[in-house]
């Protein structure tokens, strides 16, 4: 959304059996992606060069962070430091902003 404000939940929809993504920003200074997870979908363990912030728009989102699980709900936000191994996704449909 560049010209006018937009409700993030209306930009992307949860689809069964898929992880759907939409880039909101991909500049060298800021990368932000909107993600929608179908039931049981996830993104495997990763390490990113910069800090990563997750904000859950809807549903519940388990985040596995260096061996332990944190459950984020709608409205929750969590920052993961750079080079920290983590994975996101779980058995429920959910949507989040990642950047």
Regions found by a protein language model. Give the residues of each.
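Ligand-binding loop in jelly-roll beta-barrel domains
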Residues: 82-99
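A short, N-terminal "cap"/entry segment at the start of jelly-roll beta-barrel domains
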Residues: 1-29
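Conserved short histidine dyad/triad with adjacent acidic residue
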Residues: 17-18, 31-48
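Short, conserved beta-strand element in jelly-roll/cupin
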Residues: 36-38, 47-63
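Structural motif
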Residues: 31, 60-62, 69, 85, ...
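Short acidic-glycine-tyrosine-enriched beta hairpin
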Residues: 67-83
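Short, surface-exposed secondary-structure edge patches
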Residues: 34, 44, 53, 68-71
